Amino acid sequence: MAHPVAVGMLLMKAGYRDEVVAAGILHDTDEDTDYKLKDIKHDFGEEIAEIVAGCSEPDKSLSWEDRKEHTIEFLKNASSDIRAVACADKLHNIRSIIKDYEQDGDEVWQRFNRGKEQQEWYYTNLVESLRHQGAFSLVEELEKEVIRLFKR
């Protein structure tokens, strides 16, 4: 529960509209719960459901690499609202990784499907993808955290 709220708070502090903040809070529900996009659309409207859908990974049967490559390519041309929610999600994720890294060191990489090198590839390319249409405050923060974690 803490992660979705943290994503919403990042968006709120960055000045995004209520609909974007709500989508940030709901961004993982379709993938991680029984509350699906049709439920979000019914309860919160088409706009919020579309933002959440844009932040969801494709078919989980695809390899980690294929899913991440899809995300990187999709976000290059996604709407500014989808890019903001995706960026806030990754920003909170990387800050959590940094916190764990500071406590556990390189052992932290054992918790992931792919190791440090692949995570660095993903986050570095994600930053470039998110800024493809132009930089914004959350992507600048994400880039700083990526450098902080991987350029130690």
Short names for language-model regions:
Residues 1-152:
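Active-site helical microenvironments for divalent-metal-assisted chemistry
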